[in-house]
């Protein structure tokens, strides 16, 4: 600590200034606070980045205390006093509750507080005992809680990392409570962030699972870096300060502790058979890899994956489990709907409707569970021969008072029941009314089970009768969104009634039943036994799904599961993906079916009063029965308490044992650890889940923890061991280890593909280079063909070749993407125009060939023109020097990724062509999975804050955000990716399928798995839509010039990449001295800046600029610096990945090592020490080595060449056919073209451009508007003009050339759009417009459009109305 005393500055005398560099704090003492002091504080904080605390500084405003009390308004009763001591504001508060409440208020009013208090003021709390009268007030009081207690730790010296050692008492983030004290805080590290600046600061985020804290390391960063990692438990010691309204620890010492992990210490481990991951749609936060890692740490032999409704995590789960050496069990928690349930039950005889007696009944009860709830009202109506002949009604006094909730639902009060008969008195009488009738009810299971159970309780009878459910009848006979009794009554037009009173409900249900009888008779159903035929017509969307666990037993089972999942998304999706019970029965081979949670069919039936015989019948369907810890139900669950759940589980155990079924205890895992519950709460908060904050204990449990929970239920150690350890392991042993994907390519089959590719390649090679081929060509072609054919990739080349040829024959050029241009075979087959050979001359006549080994020429297009020394014909120039390895790996075994850019207009036709080639059921769009991004996760956590009223610390918010980030939101599709299934396989051999984002109107199916996970098994063809080929097609149509024939060394075209001279415009007025506005890849402000700095003079340099602009950390903070410092020229720096391999091989490096270095660098992995050493041995320049270290991503040269080739062709038309260029540009890229502004002239355009350029944070529309106006201004400066839309001349969508002007199309009129524009042209082609009235009558034009057209002169001399004359 450095100290300076009695320092005078301006008019201020400083008693002392103390500097603590370890804490990054400056303590200043002054006699009186003033504006000069405030200015000095700001200056010091800005220049030093230290925190400045002013001791003794108090604003002169004597009313400061009053203003603070005013700010705290409603909290004033809890404040005993406000005291200023030096730089401290001490709030003396009445009790712990007051402290917490006021601290929360201070955080929410931080901005106002900062304006009131002098800089550096520390806020302290002093808790005093509240007076008796305050405690008696009707205000929320906390439970009396003790001052947070720290723990004493024994610290080993070898664990100490640096600085001060921990204090005797150590706190955790949720227990800290005093500021400005030397404090030690223990927690788990969940984030480490390094902030670079004048001073480097390391932020360490600690948590104890309840709260989190930011710890700042200032001057000892190098002592900490690399010494602690995520997941470590540390003790950080330092000054605990209030910073930005929340506690922050300024670290002066760190000690690492051995982590006290939850571990599974059971000698025999359990198996988890029910777990959800982040792929369960916005419901779970378990990371797949962390789940498997934990299972491995605990020694579990196997674990299952059962996400809600999908299996998208399977590929990731398998890879993680395989690496961990544990058995992966694939599964799903399905949304099962029982489409096989009977409409009429217990029917033991047959009868016509007329000869049967029906009793339609309804009960009002105290709750939903017949085991514990009671009947309080009976209403019943008897029907004979289609007529209502009798009624029964009574209220019943229950054994205990009814709840307020029951009264609210039923309208029955306790007073109404006081003098009524008991159920024991009523039931015998009601049974007499029922006689031998068939019972009818709406949602009949509910009423029937209550009646049967209470007959058993009261009379000891095992009573069963046939019963019909009008709910099931409604789902068979009506099409509705809701089948509640109210909705059905309304649908049938039966008038209003008083719902939730038993007799009223029974009467109206009787009317509903009689109407249904009429409807059944009309479709030929006249007997009771025939009612069952209706179940085949039940709408699956009307059936309520229940949970069901399905596990994959073998490969056949996996395929069957994929089929079921596919149908659930494609055929039966309604709110959730539904699996029909009938479909599961049909595809059950290789699957094990579990009863799932208490929301499953079996659990639900048990809670709704099903008899043992009913439960046995339901349980027979399942291979195993699940029970779960009682605390997987939230503590305040209204409809189910834990004692009742215990009874249900014991009953299910007895039934399962009787049926010889396994009973297993599962965890219904949704997060890994108990402390993660808040993360799931934050995930559910914005989703309308009313009980989100009270999270059940859905964490992964150890064997001991699960045994303890089993004992709570069964109170028997043998049963506990059976359900926790033995049975789950037995099920795991029944399951084979299945590999979902083979990680080897299954290409589609095209007969003789190998021979065709070889034949086409050689034929074209001979045509271009002659027979015999030059040695360099022969070797390259043979090497590539051998790699392509031997690894089974010929079919990929053939598909791409056919696609490109089809597009070209239809008049649309195709651009290549990625590294396909690295392949000479691809070039010879016409897949790409990029020739990867070294720069060379070739003669089209006599086949003379010569490679030019001259470092001045990086591209064949740059070679000087020459005539053939043999025959005198002009030589062709080509070659871009791209190694094949960048495409298919050093061994030529990497799956070739052929990406093609089709015209946006042609893309759909290209996709249809692929479908025709292989069959629609063998071509699917490449699926994607969209997850919650970090920014969106912040929104979830903010919603959690708002709904709970809990202000979170920044560190705790970071913790929750990290848990939510990556949770699946929805699905989508790759913009052009097509996955091809070989003809000898089904798609279900690889993946389920679905609609993208579950949109039935999408018209296409996607792979259920994200395409990246199946990329190694299936061929993916990228047929993307792009503007540039459309641009080229329109230019070709406008000029009649084939763009593939233009000279790629045209000097004027090349010149616009470094000046505006060929355009003939003033660079000052254009505000650019390069002419690339509107040129793809070169028109952006960033790339134009690169062009200005580098002034490229060759095609090869344009390729370098393209590579530099598409890489990450390749130009800025890298190549640009080496050029400016004079270490290298543009032609020397690393611009594309291929540059590294070529340069190192040129230096004499062994090619395989050069390839490895290139691969490392392009992926942002830098270079190893061994690689660096080898580079230095070959005298590779230091700047080159440093450049490799800085690069995060490198663009492939082949991709850059393809982009530049397309751009150069478009630029050629801009220079030599300007109006055609501008017509095409504004037609295709002019979405933000504003005719109203443009027609005002040059000065108005310049003004708007200045406004746009001055804007910060422009959205996409504003950026596009700026780009369009730049091209508009350039066109005008070149001497051309725009003509307003004309009702007689304009096209719907295209800019038309008229003399030296462009006629604006109709769709550029604001608010008009393509549809209206096309209607105008269509009507005009039928016959000319005769009036405005005629125009509006025959088109989609409205009054607002007409007003705009009038203002711009679009209507010309068109009269307003029809004019008729006799002569």
Curated annotation (Swiss-Prot):
<keyword id="KW-0269">Exonuclease</keyword>
<dbReference type="GO" id="GO:0003677">
    <property type="term" value="F:DNA binding"/>
</dbReference>
<dbReference type="Pfam" id="PF01336">
    <property type="entry name" value="tRNA_anti-codon"/>
</dbReference>
<keyword id="KW-0239">DNA-directed DNA polymerase</keyword>
<dbReference type="InterPro" id="IPR006054">
    <property type="entry name" value="DnaQ"/>
</dbReference>
<comment type="similarity">
    <text>Belongs to the DNA polymerase type-C family. PolC subfamily.</text>
</comment>
<dbReference type="GO" id="GO:0003887">
    <property type="term" value="F:DNA-directed DNA polymerase activity"/>
</dbReference>
<dbReference type="InterPro" id="IPR004013">
    <property type="entry name" value="PHP_dom"/>
</dbReference>
<dbReference type="InterPro" id="IPR004805">
    <property type="entry name" value="DnaE2/DnaE/PolC"/>
</dbReference>
<comment type="function">
    <text>Required for replicative DNA synthesis. This DNA polymerase also exhibits 3' to 5' exonuclease activity.</text>
</comment>
<dbReference type="InterPro" id="IPR036397">
    <property type="entry name" value="RNaseH_sf"/>
</dbReference>
<dbReference type="InterPro" id="IPR012337">
    <property type="entry name" value="RNaseH-like_sf"/>
</dbReference>
<dbReference type="Pfam" id="PF02811">
    <property type="entry name" value="PHP"/>
</dbReference>
<dbReference type="InterPro" id="IPR006308">
    <property type="entry name" value="Pol_III_a_PolC-type_gram_pos"/>
</dbReference>
<dbReference type="Pfam" id="PF00929">
    <property type="entry name" value="RNase_T"/>
</dbReference>
<dbReference type="Pfam" id="PF17657">
    <property type="entry name" value="DNA_pol3_finger"/>
</dbReference>
<keyword id="KW-0540">Nuclease</keyword>
<dbReference type="InterPro" id="IPR012340">
    <property type="entry name" value="NA-bd_OB-fold"/>
</dbReference>
<dbReference type="InterPro" id="IPR029460">
    <property type="entry name" value="DNAPol_HHH"/>
</dbReference>
<keyword id="KW-0808">Transferase</keyword>
<dbReference type="InterPro" id="IPR044923">
    <property type="entry name" value="PolC_middle_finger_sf"/>
</dbReference>
<dbReference type="InterPro" id="IPR004365">
    <property type="entry name" value="NA-bd_OB_tRNA"/>
</dbReference>
<keyword id="KW-0963">Cytoplasm</keyword>
<dbReference type="GO" id="GO:0008408">
    <property type="term" value="F:3'-5' exonuclease activity"/>
</dbReference>
<dbReference type="GO" id="GO:0006261">
    <property type="term" value="P:DNA-templated DNA replication"/>
</dbReference>
<keyword id="KW-0548">Nucleotidyltransferase</keyword>
<protein>
    <recommendedName>
        <fullName>DNA polymerase III PolC-type</fullName>
        <ecNumber>2.7.7.7</ecNumber>
    </recommendedName>
</protein>
<keyword id="KW-0235">DNA replication</keyword>
<keyword id="KW-0378">Hydrolase</keyword>
<dbReference type="InterPro" id="IPR040982">
    <property type="entry name" value="DNA_pol3_finger"/>
</dbReference>
<dbReference type="InterPro" id="IPR013520">
    <property type="entry name" value="Exonuclease_RNaseT/DNA_pol3"/>
</dbReference>
<dbReference type="InterPro" id="IPR003141">
    <property type="entry name" value="Pol/His_phosphatase_N"/>
</dbReference>
<dbReference type="Pfam" id="PF07733">
    <property type="entry name" value="DNA_pol3_alpha"/>
</dbReference>
<feature type="domain" description="Exonuclease">
    <location>
        <begin position="358"/>
        <end position="513"/>
    </location>
</feature>
<dbReference type="Pfam" id="PF14579">
    <property type="entry name" value="HHH_6"/>
</dbReference>
<dbReference type="GO" id="GO:0005737">
    <property type="term" value="C:cytoplasm"/>
</dbReference>
<dbReference type="InterPro" id="IPR011708">
    <property type="entry name" value="DNA_pol3_alpha_NTPase_dom"/>
</dbReference>
């Amino acid at each position: 600590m450095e100290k300076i005393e009695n320092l005078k500055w301006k008019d201020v005398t400083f008693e002392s200034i103390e500097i603590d560099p370890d804490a990054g704090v400056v303590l200043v003492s002054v006699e009186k606070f003033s504006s000069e002091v405030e200015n000095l504080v700001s200056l010091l904080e800005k220049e030093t980045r230290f925190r400045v605390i002013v001791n003794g500084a108090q604003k002169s405003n004597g009313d400061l205390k009053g203003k603070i009390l005013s700010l705290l308004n409603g909290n004033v009763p809890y404040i005993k006093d406000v005291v200023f001591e030096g730089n401290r504001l001490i709030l003396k508060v009445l009790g712990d509750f007051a402290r917490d409440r006021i601290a929360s208020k201070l955080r929410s009013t931080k901005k106002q507080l900062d304006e009131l208090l002098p800089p550096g003021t520390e806020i302290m709390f002093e808790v005093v005992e509240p007076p008796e009268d305050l405690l008696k007030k009707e205000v929320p009081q906390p439970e009396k809680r003790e001052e947070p207690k720290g723990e004493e730790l024994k610290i080993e010296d070898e664990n100490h990392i640096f600085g001060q050692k921990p204090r005797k008492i150590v706190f955790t983030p949720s227990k800290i409570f005093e500021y400005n004290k030397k404090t030690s805080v223990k927690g788990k590290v969940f984030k480490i962030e390094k902030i670079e600046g004048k001073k480097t600061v390391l932020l360490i985020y600690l948590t104890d699972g309840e709260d989190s804290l930011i710890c700042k390391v200032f001057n000892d960063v190098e002592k900490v870096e690399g010494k602690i990692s995520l997941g470590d438990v540390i003790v950080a010691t330092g000054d605990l300060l209030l910073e930005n309204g929340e506690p922050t620890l300024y670290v002066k010492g760190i000690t690492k502790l051995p982590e006290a992990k939850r571990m599974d210490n059971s000698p025999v481990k359990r198996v988890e058979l029910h777990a959800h991951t982040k792929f369960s749609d916005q419901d779970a936060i378990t990371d797949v890899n962390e789940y498997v890692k934990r299972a491995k740490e605990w020694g579990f032999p196997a674990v299952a994956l059962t996400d809600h409704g999908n299996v998208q995590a399977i590929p990731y789960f398998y890879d993680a489990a395989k690496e961990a050496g544990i058995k992966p069990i694939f599964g799903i928690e399905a949304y099962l709907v029982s489409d096989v349930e009977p409409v009429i039950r217990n029917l033991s005889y047959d009868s016509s409707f007329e000869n049967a007696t029906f009793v339609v009944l309804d009960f009002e009860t105290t709750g939903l569970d017949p085991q514990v709830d009671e009947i309080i009202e009976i209403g019943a109506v008897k029907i004979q021969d289609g007529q209502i002949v009798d009624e029964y009604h009574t209220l019943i006094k229950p054994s205990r008072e009814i709840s307020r909730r029951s009264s609210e639902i039923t309208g029955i009060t306790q007073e109404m029941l006081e003098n009524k008969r008991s159920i024991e008195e009523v039931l015998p009488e009601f049974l007499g009314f029922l006689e031998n009738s068939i019972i009818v009810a709406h949602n009949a299971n509910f009423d029937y089970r209550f009646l049967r159970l209470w007959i058993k309780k009261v009379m000891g009878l095992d009573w069963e009768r046939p019963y019909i459910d009008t709910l099931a009848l409604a789902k068979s006979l009506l099409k509705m969104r809701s089948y509640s009794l109210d909705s059905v009554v309304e649908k049938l037009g039966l008038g209003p009634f008083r719902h939730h009173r038993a007799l009223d409900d029974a009467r109206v249900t009787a009317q509903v039943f009689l109407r249904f009888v009429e409807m059944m008779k009309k479709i030929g159903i006249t007997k009771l036994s025939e009612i069952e035929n209706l179940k085949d017509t039940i709408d699956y969307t009307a059936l309520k799904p229940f949970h069901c666990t399905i596990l994959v037993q073998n490969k056949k089972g996996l395929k069957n599961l994929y089929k079921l999942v596919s149908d659930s998304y494609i055929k039966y999706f309604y709110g959730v993906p539904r699996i029909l019970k009938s479909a599961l029965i049909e595809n059950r081979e290789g699957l094990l079916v579990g009863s799932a949670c208490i929301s499953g069919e079996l659990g639900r039936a048990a809670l709704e009063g099903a008899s043992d015989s009913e439960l046995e019948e339901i349980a027979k369907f399942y291979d195993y029965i699940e029970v779960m810890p009682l605390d997987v139900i939230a503590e305040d669950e209204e409809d189910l308490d834990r004692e009742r759940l215990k009874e249900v589980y014991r009953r299910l155990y007895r039934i399962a044992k009787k049926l010889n079924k396994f009973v297993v205890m599962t965890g219904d895992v949704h997060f890994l650890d108990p402390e993660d519950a808040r993360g799931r709460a934050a995930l559910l908060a914005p989703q309308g889940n009313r009980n989100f904050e009270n999270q059940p204990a859905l964490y992964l449990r150890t064997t001991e923890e699960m045994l303890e929970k089993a004992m709570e239920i069964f109170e028997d150690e043998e049963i506990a061991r059976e359900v926790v350890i033995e049975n789950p392991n037995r099920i795991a042993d029944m399951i084979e280890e299945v590999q979902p994907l083979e990680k080897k390519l299954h290409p589609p089959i095209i007969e003789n593909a190998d021979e065709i590719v070889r034949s086409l390649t050689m034929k074209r090679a001979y045509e271009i280079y002659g027979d015999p081929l030059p040695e360099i060509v022969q070797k390259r072609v043979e090497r590539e063909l051998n790699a392509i054919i031997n690894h089974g990739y010929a079919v990929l080349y053939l598909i791409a070749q056919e696609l490109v040829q089809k597009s070209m024959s239809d008049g649309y050029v195709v651009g290549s993407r990625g590294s396909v241009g690295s392949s000479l075979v691809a070039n010879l087959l016409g897949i790409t125009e990029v020739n990867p050979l070294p720069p060379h001359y070739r003669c089209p006549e006599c086949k003379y060939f010569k490679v030019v080994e001259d470092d001045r020429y990086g591209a064949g297009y740059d070679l000087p023109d020459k005539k053939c020394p043999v025959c005198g014909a002009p030589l062709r120039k080509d070659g871009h020097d791209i190694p094949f390895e960048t495409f298919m790996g050093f061994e030529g075994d990497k799956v070739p990724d052929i990406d093609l850019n089709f015209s946006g207009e042609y893309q759909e036709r290209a996709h249809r062509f692929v479908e025709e080639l292989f069959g629609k059921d063998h071509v699917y769009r490449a699926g994607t999975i969209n997850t919650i991004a970090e920014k969106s996760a912040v929104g979830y956590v903010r919603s959690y804050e708002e709904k709970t009223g809990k202000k979170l610390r920044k560190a705790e918010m970071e913790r929750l955000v990290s848990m939510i980030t990556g949770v699946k939101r929805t699905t989508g599709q790759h913009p052009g990716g097509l996955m091809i299934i070989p003809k000898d396989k089904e798609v279900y051999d690889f993946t389920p399928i679905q609609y993208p984002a579950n949109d039935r109107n999408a018209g296409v199916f996607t792979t259920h798995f994200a395409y990246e996970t199946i990329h190694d098994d299936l061929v993916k063809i990228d047929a993307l839509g792009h503007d540039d080929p459309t641009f080229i097609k329109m230019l070709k149509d406008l000029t009649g010039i084939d763009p593939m024939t233009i000279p790629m060394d045209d000097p004027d075209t090349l010149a616009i990449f470094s000046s505006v001279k060929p355009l003939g415009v003033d660079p000052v007025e254009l505000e650019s001295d390069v002419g690339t506005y509107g040129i793809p890849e070169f028109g952006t402000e960033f790339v134009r800046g690169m062009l200005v700095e580098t002034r490229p003079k060759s095609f090869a340099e344009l390729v370098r600029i393209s590579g530099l602009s598409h890489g990450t950390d390749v130009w800025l903070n890298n190549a640009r610096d080496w050029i400016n410092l004079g270490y290298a020229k543009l032609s020397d720096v690393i611009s594309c990945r291929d540059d590294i391999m070529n340069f190192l091989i040129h230096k004499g490096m062994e090619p395989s090592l050069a390839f490895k270095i290139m691969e490392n660098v392009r992926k942002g992995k830098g270079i190893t020490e061994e690689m660096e050493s080898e580079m230095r041995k070959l005298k590779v320049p230091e700047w080159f080595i440093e450049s490799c270290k800085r690069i995060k991503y490198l663009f492939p040269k082949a991709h850059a060449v393809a982009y530049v080739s397309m751009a150069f062709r478009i630029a050629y038309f801009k220079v030599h056919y300007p109006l055609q260029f501008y017509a095409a540009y504004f037609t295709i890229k002019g979405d933000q073209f504003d005719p109203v502004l443009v027609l005002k002239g040059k000065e108005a355009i310049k003004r708007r451009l200045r406004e746009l350029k001055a804007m910060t944070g422009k959205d996409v529309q504003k950026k596009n508007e700026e780009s369009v106006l730049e091209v508009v201004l350039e066109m005008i400066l070149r001497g051309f003009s725009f003509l307003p839309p004309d009702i007689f001349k304009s096209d719907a969508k295209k800019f038309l050339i008229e003399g030296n002007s462009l006629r604006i199309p109709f769709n550029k009129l604001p608010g008009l759009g393509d549809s209206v524009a096309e209607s105008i042209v269509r009507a005009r082609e039928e016959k000319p417009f005769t009036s405005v009235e005629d125009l509006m009558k025959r088109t989609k034009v409205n009054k607002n459009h007409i007003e705009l057209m009038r203002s711009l002169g679009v209507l010309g001399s068109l009269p307003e109305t029809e004019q008729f004359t006799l002569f």
